[in-house]
Amino acid sequence: MKEKNTFGILIVLSSSLCFAIVPSSAKISLDFGSSLFILLFSRCLIGLVLLLPFLFFQKESVYIKKNYVLPVVFSSIVSVSLIAAVYHAIEYINIALGMTIVYAFPIGIALITSIRGEEKYSLREWLSILTVIFGLFILVYDEMFTGSLYGIVICIISLILMTTFVYTSSKLADSLGSIVLNFHLNLWSLIFLFISYVLFSFTLKIPDNSIGLTSLFFNGLFYILSYTLFFWGSRFIGVTRTSVLSLTDPIFATVIAMIFLNQFLSIIESLGFIVVLVSIYFFERSKITKKP
């Protein structure tokens, strides 16, 4: 049990490390001329292509039972809508504020699993979750207060979509497996994006140099790695613990920025950094000590 628990934690932390690269690679690709539609479409297409060899070598069937089709389609639509909503929101508000709102999704996951009787949480665990969110708030405090009410509303919608996507998809991953689930999520997302293009004629523009194209590829690569590892890890340690541990995403992003971009933290940001790490530690310690 202890080995399984440790393995699950390592998988989720690996997922967070991968996801920390996604926003930067997306921004570089967009800065070098990629349209948003191409970014989203290539992300799903790259994920689909990369998962095929794993399905082949593991001899996994891509076919799923009829009773799973509608839930998978629903999760795919929610996934694409989530990404579109987040990118739309940050056109109106600071990205730090937007991501802080969206990263509150573990509270939603904890509420759902608690109400449905799937998990029970102690007061210390609730306080740990809330303190993690507060730590993220401190971490991005200096950059937060710019934007509009409209952007905040869109971010709240994104938060609801994120909570819905993570909860429904984690349940599907328990039944279908992470690789099969992510294959279908990307497949149906591509279909949904294609239909959207036919209806609305979105701009198609690829990056205009090798740096942009490379960033486009890495965006798709680390996106599919992060979600595949996320749902794989949730099968070992549960969706709530996975969600809370995924809040290390901005921590990894901060460390990457410090190493490669020489962007160091202020005193307030450092305090937020420490609060997040300590809160996650106490949440995990509480979960582990509760296990028989």
Predicted feature locations:
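C-terminal-most transmembrane helix of multi-pass membrane proteins
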Residues: 44, 141, 212, 247-292
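C-terminal transmembrane-helix exit sites in multi-pass transporters
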Residues: 50, 55, 86, 105-127, ...
